[in-house]
Swiss-Prot record:
Assembly information from the UniProt record: Homodimer.
Domain VOC, chain residue ranges per copy: 18-149, 181-339
EC number, UniProt record: 1.13.11.27
Domain of life according to the entry: Eukaryota
Compartment(s) where it occurs, according to its Swiss-Prot or TrEMBL record: Cytoplasm; Endoplasmic reticulum membrane; Golgi apparatus membrane
Protein name per its UniProtKB record: 4-hydroxyphenylpyruvate dioxygenase
Pfam families: Glyoxalase
GO cellular component: endoplasmic reticulum membrane; Golgi membrane
Top EC class for this record: oxidoreductase
GO MF terms, alphabetically ordered: 4-hydroxyphenylpyruvate dioxygenase activity; lactoylglutathione lyase activity; metal ion binding; protein homodimerization activity
Cofactor notes: Binds 1 Fe cation per subunit.
Essential cofactor(s): Fe cation
Amino acid sequence: MTSYTDKGEKPERGKFLNFHHIKFWVGNAKQAAVFYCDKFGFEPLAYKGLETGSREVVSHAVRQDKIIFVFESALNPGNEEMGEHMIKHGDGVKDVAFLVEDCDFLVKKAKERGAAVLKEPWVEQDAGGKVKYAIVQTYGDTTHTFVEYLGPYKGLFLPGYKEPLFRDPLLPKLPSGHLSFIDHIVGNQPDDEMVPVSDWYQKCLLFHRFWSIDDKQIHTEYSALRSIVVTNYEETIKMPINEPAMGKKKSQIQEYIDYNGGPGVQHIALNTSNIIQAIVNLRARGLEFLSAPDNYYESLREKLKTAKIKVKEDLKTLQELKILVDFDDKGYLLQIFTKPVQDRPTLFLEVIQRNNHFGFGAGNFKSLFEAIEKDQDARGNLTVLTAQNQSVSKAFQ
């Protein structure tokens, strides 16, 4: 495991401030929004569809504290772009949007450094105000939208969105999800694409390496991974980039690549200040999580006896809830992962609480992999790895 202190070149102008929202392309946006509201504790935020004058695409935006997810579906049978995307990838993340300052300059610089700009800056407005956007290509079919507010925006979400058509009376009766903001978003790559992708973020967006780990440190009996975390200059946006490493059997990273039809967003980590209450509530709402064996906690108790930090939370409760713990000399983190949130074994979510710890759970990767491998085996996908021809994503050639 390596942490980096060199932030690299400081952007002369413009800023990436934070994650603005995550856009999902799904088969049925209405039902997807209901699922995330029901299981994760989101609430309807805004709507765009036939009733608001959007004739091609319907959008349901949901929010929990500072987290905004947008679910989009095609309204018409002739939408080839969204139709082909659904056939190839299934439901999943299409776009990770960043709130920025000086969108024009950031796009100009990204373009000069080789980024594929899919849509040059444009402005939309309504009674709430003006917003500037631009779209750049990242790994696979995933994109980044830059969002810049041109003055205070007083609307519900973004121009064109209106009040949700319906608010489920059941939602206020359910326990809070206790989820606060997006901690990090992980992208899975085919073998040998991790470095080109992380280099792209450093070159085109002036991100820098924050953390990395290799397959000598992260492996099970069967499989392994490598990971590089890139972040913006202010370190408010963290994007781990994973790739599979050769092992005896197919890794869960390779399983994702196979079922997603290439690279894409593997998981979204949501930060909480009270993971115990969050997981008690989310389990009560019917959310499914990966499990950890009891011997994980037996080993953890032994390691904590000589640790320089003290975990404040009750270990018995953490064990009952199957929450994982990782720590160093300065602090610790608590984390747990959902099972895939669609039929394809692709996207899942993470709930994380940080206590003066800025890593990504390297000490838990082995336990996480073994838990996923158990489910992977049940799916018939923990198979002997065979060499495959894999092409580099267009954005990085």
